[in-house]
Amino acid sequence: MSKALLRYIRLSPTKARLVAREVQGMNAELAIASLEFMPNKAAKVISKVIASAVANGGMGAENAVVKSCRVDAGPVLRRFTPRARGRATPIRKPTSHVFVEVVEQSKDK
């Protein structure tokens, strides 16, 4: 089993979780191929983390299965934009931590 972790990525955790659920339990090679055609920013990020987890384990992507793909919320960057009458309203810029575990596929299947 090998792991990869990407922290403080400027990405909404809610939107990233939608993509993470899609690849859980998939073959790593198939997961990377399917993420390539998704239009989301999260798809590109998660694809890189899966590739990193496969490389960390020293196995081929065709022999690896995504055991878990988890997206946790990181700190929220708060910025302010000026509004009318001297006021300011906050802009929230959420960050995420992406965690991927990859296991080698059993040979008997």
Curated annotation (Swiss-Prot):
One function term, GO molecular function aspect: rRNA binding
Stored SUPFAM superfamilies: Ribosomal protein L22 (SSF54843)
Keywords: Ribonucleoprotein, Ribosomal protein, RNA-binding, rRNA-binding
Family annotation (Pfam families): Ribosomal_L22
Record text on subunit structure and interactions: Part of the 50S ribosomal subunit.
Family the entry assigns: Belongs to the universal ribosomal protein uL22 family.
The protein, known as: Large ribosomal subunit protein uL22
Species of origin: Wolinella succinogenes (strain ATCC 29543 / DSM 1740 / CCUG 13145 / JCM 31913 / LMG 7466 / NCTC 11488 / FDC 602W) (Vibrio succinogenes)
Gene: rplV
